[in-house]
Amino acid sequence: MAFNFNWSPLMADAGFYTRAQDLLTAALNKSPKPPIIVDDIVVTELNLGSNPPELEILEIGDLAEDRFRGIFKMSYAGDAVLTLKTCVQANPLNTYLLTRHPFTSPQPLAAATGLTIPLQITLSDIKLSGFVILVFSKQKGITVVFRNDPLESLKVSSTFDSIPFVRDYLQKEIEGQLRILFMDELPAIIHRLSLRLWSTEYSELETTCDQVTNPSLEGPGQDPLLNPPQDPVDSFGNVLSISEIASLSLDSGVEMHSLFSRKNALRIAALTDSQRTLSLFTPSIREVVFRAWTGSIEQADGPSGLVSPMSPPLSRTQSHITVASAPLSSQDTASVASSQSRPGLPSSGYSGYGLSLGAARHSKAHARKRKKRVIDLRPHRKPTDDMASISGESSCTDSTITTTTKSAASVYSSSIIPEENNDDDPVTPPVSPVRNSTVRRRQTLRDRIVDRDDAERTNIRRPPIPAEFGHEFPLRPTQPLPSNEIDRNVTSPNPKPEDSHHFQPPRQDTAPIRNIPSAPLGPPAPAPIPASASAYPPEKPTYTQSFPPSFMEVAHNGSILEQAWMMKMASEIARRIQDENSSAMGSYVGSGSGSGGFWDRSHTPPPAYRH
């Protein structure tokens, strides 16, 4: 079976080409276009050529007078020509930014400006080869479906043929669009054309739809002055009267004024004034936005120098609202100061009312903490006359425990805390009486001891304690020992018992204790002792003559616990004084011999309680 194609009538019919161009234009603009094409694609020329396609029958499914269905193999290598016109984007950065999310783009101004160039593309030397399913019916028209991609090759000629990479890019993009056209859009175009040729009902329906969608421009036009706004103004903001509106017409030779509603004009003016982004005297520059003015000072320096009372400045608007609010109470001053940096409420009076309520409700809760009272029901011993007589000495010993807390805690496992008198508040004792009393008495006791020592001060002074001992007392400037004192200490390291009362070692001015001789009683040494060991006392010193009588009187007059506590404190004080004296004497003697450092000496253990 053979078919004879009559290709010449298609070329002779001018109406066919017009309808085909319109359908192709609609099809090319319907599909998603690449971002480089920024204008509509218009088909300006369409010519099917003189060479018809070649068809090979593969299968016939249905054959009748008014219908036909078959599968063909089509081959076309004719002289058809298709010319398109559009506009393309020549700036690749603009194309890149259009295809990306605005959050990830750097938002350039000048570099991303579009550069539109007109483009004319001519498609020729089209070669097609594929399998076609053809269905014909007088009632339903012709349906052509391609089972595979029919496009083999195509020649693209454009205005950018002199630029190789642009030519290759256009070639690839147009081939991709034509493949979509043959597979999706071309069957629909052929079907609509066949319905126009053979179905009169469809042609009448399509004509009616065109009249509805594209109404004719013939006839009188609509007069915009027929229904003017209620409060019209001209372009300068002047209100127009009814007579002036009636004098205006579309056919008048006078210049046409733009009519605006006065309410809308005021809203637009307020919006423009509040933003302050452009000045009226600034020349218009494309793709440029000026920054907003930051305050009234910059507004006054601007070209106009006018500030509209209708709209406050753009910056710190809430601050102006807060300043204009009503005066608040004294409790709300802190709240008002902190609220000036936050957005204010719509009503200044209401904001002050809310602040005063909040401040009054929470002012008492945060003013002071509630005092927790603890009632002490334990029995307290009343001070006796003997204890009252030696109150000065007991206060001295109370202060010494604070200075020797660290050393005493490491040597003795138990400590006895003296009782205190709470005469100020007998019902509510303080939380920590020992700590508070020591803090209060420390400075006063030191001054008392310094005054007591000033009366007994002699001219003999020793050098300051080395820094390696880590004493907490501030050192006063001291004078070096005389040479005769140093020689006497070196030659007689162990004084006789009868001379122990007259011997006084070098004193430390800043220690809060009295002068206590550090050389205890002991038998005289038969052999001379080295200078490095001359400052160390024997292991078991006697405390009867090494402590002031005041300590012993307190111990005899007090109870057993007080006596034990006093003896413990006295032994601790004696140990510290002996260490200080031995370090001072060793530093002077060892400096001449070159031996006897701090780490070379061994400290004696603290003495035990006296039995």
UniProtKB/Swiss-Prot annotation:
Mitochondrion in keyword set: yes
Keywords: Lipid transport, Lipid-binding, Membrane, Mitochondrion, Mitochondrion outer membrane, Transmembrane, Transmembrane beta strand, Transport
Any one GO BP annotation for this protein: mitochondrion-endoplasmic reticulum membrane tethering
GO function terms (MF aspect): lipid binding
Any one cellular-component term (Gene Ontology): ERMES complex
Biased composition (Polar residues): 325-342
HAMAP family assigned: Mdm34
Subunit structure: Component of the ER-mitochondria encounter structure (ERMES) or MDM complex, composed of MMM1, MDM10, MDM12 and MDM34.
Protein name: Mitochondrial distribution and morphology protein 34
Source species: Paracoccidioides brasiliensis (strain Pb18)
Gene that produces this protein: MDM34
